[in-house]
Structure formats: structure tokens, C-alpha cells
Regions:
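Consensus positions within tandem repeat domains that build extended binding/scaffold surfaces
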Residues: 41-42, 102-107
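Structural signature of tandem-repeat unit edges
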Residues: 1-11, 19-36, 48-100, 110-116
Length: 116
């Protein structure tokens, strides 16, 4: 699993998850920053892709690979690790330190049956 994130006030905001499965476990910490927020449209298939790519290019949003503990240069392509979004999402585990869930974070995630 990989995570797109941004840093706000020293805390990580998860903007997107990437995985082949249908479950996401948001870590309590990304790249040394506590995860306190799930961004708007994080699991929605209706995210503004142009804005997101612009933020990736400007390094406002970064990609983190927990397996290596390192940042990646670009967004994974769908064949390597697809975005976990929309009808694909069935289970999401949130960290205890999460304080905010952004607007439409689970928009059209109609298969979502478990949120922990």
C-alpha cells in the first residue's frame, strides 16, 4: 500500500491510498508525522485529478511507501499500484489520532461495509 499525503501544521493529511486490494489501513504516522486528517475525496473516484497532479508536481503532495519507509517521486500508475477508490473500497481502518475526515472522503464508496 502507498499513500499520497500532504503536511499541514506538522501533521500528515492522507489524500489518497493505493493498493490492489479492497481494504485500507491508514497508519498513525507517515514519514515521521502523525496522521490527523483524511483529505477531501480521499477514497472517491471523483477527485479533481488535474489539481492533484499539479500538487504532486509542486511537491505539495507526496507519495509515501511504508514498505520502504521512503517517499516516491511520482504517483504510482494503475498497473503498478492502482488508487483504492469508489466501489473498490470495502474496509477502512483509521488511526486513533485521526481528528478530521474531509468532505466527500467516501463519496460513492457504495461497497464500504466496515469503518474502524
Amino acid at each position: 500500500m502507498r499513500f499520497a499525503y500532504e503536511i499541514k501544521n506538522g501533521c500528515a493529511v492522507v489524500r489518497r491510498c493505493y493498493d490492489f486490494g479492497n481494504e485500507a489501513e491508514i497508519p498513525s504516522e507517515i514519514d515521521g508525522h502523525p496522521v490527523t486528517e483524511l483529505g477531501a475525496y480521499a477514497f472517491s473516484a471523483h477527485m479533481d485529478r488535474e489539481q492533484f497532479w499539479h500538487e504532486l508536481e509542486n511537491r505539495t503532495v507526496k507519495i509515501w511507501n511504508p514498505e520502504t519507509g521512503e517517499q516516491e517521486v511520482s504517483e504510482p500508475d494503475a498497473e503498478t499500484v492502482p488508487g483504492l477508490q469508489g466501489m473498490q473500497v470495502e474496509t477502512v481502518r483509521l488511526p486513533e489520532g485521526l481528528r478530521k475526515i474531509g468532505a466527500y472522503a467516501f463519496y460513492n464508496c457504495n461497497a464500504l461495509s466496515e469503518l474502524h
